[in-house]
Amino acid sequence: IEQTNIPNQFSYLWPYSGTFSAVNALFEATHDKKYLRLLDKRVLPGLEEYFDTQRTPNAYSSYIQTAPASDRFYDDNVWLGIDFTDIYQITGEQKYLDKAQLIWKFIESGTDNLLGGGIYWCEQKKESKNTCSNAPGSVLAFKLFKATNDSVYFKQGKDLYEWTQK
């Protein structure tokens, strides 16, 4: 049987993470607590199925943890960090900021001085530093600065923004 003919049992991280963004947007627009409950009881527990604690720094993998190890993409994690920071800004609940900061540690691990800086696209394939990782990476750093007032995030956001402009 060809593997290409067998559909995956679960979604990849990238499409599943859109659920987090959507529920965040609904909660932000309505402030209806049912969306926060949906996030905490359904969306985030599902998201945790992708959280990889076997590799450090910890981060979200592209597929669930009960499957063989899968690639970890910096851009996918950046968007999750943005969502966690946004929901923290709305609720003030520390658990969301903690997760965003944990994700940022993974994002930092995807930077080096080759090409003058920037974030790679994929941890396992350090072949490209794309705008899809760097532009939202800058946004996440600035959002973390706003949430924490830690100037390190501001500097990192500025550096990524300037690198992306080159």
Where are these regions (language model features)?
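Glycan-recognition and catalytic cores of secretory/periplasmic carbohydrate-active enzymes
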Residues: 1-166
